């Protein structure tokens, strides 16, 4: 049976890729053979993640971005297409750690701050 989740040689963009969630996803997908593109505001951290992936034999690149700036995102898209020729997947991990938009182990989804959750949701959709 074919592997239904094969990401080998797929170009995967991760917004917020320098964050905790984005970094974890990037590392795993790189181990599975994906070509990782980290988009984030934190250049130093993003470049370190790329270096870590490359040190393990993976392929990755970093592009400085701001997910709230459409012009920068359009330029990111052009640069990524120029480098890789295609985009196979986009994972939006930006904004996920905003205070109030997450809950602890002793809370339920009903304890979420709805305004903070909406802000994170809007960032992810942009």
Where are these regions (language model features)?
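Canonical Rossmann dinucleotide-binding motif of NAD(H)/NADP(H)-dependent dehydrogenases/reductases
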Residues: 3-37
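A structural preference for long, well-packed, hydrophobic secondary-structure segments
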Residues: 14-27, 45, 62-68, 86, ...
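Conserved glycine-rich Rossmann-like NAD(P)H-binding loop of the short-chain dehydrogenase/reductase
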Residues: 32-49
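Short, conserved SAM-binding/catalytic segment
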Residues: 49-57
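Substrate-binding pocket helix/loop in short-chain dehydrogenase/reductase
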Residues: 101-118
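Conserved small/polar residues in nucleotide/adenosyl-binding loops
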Residues: 125-126
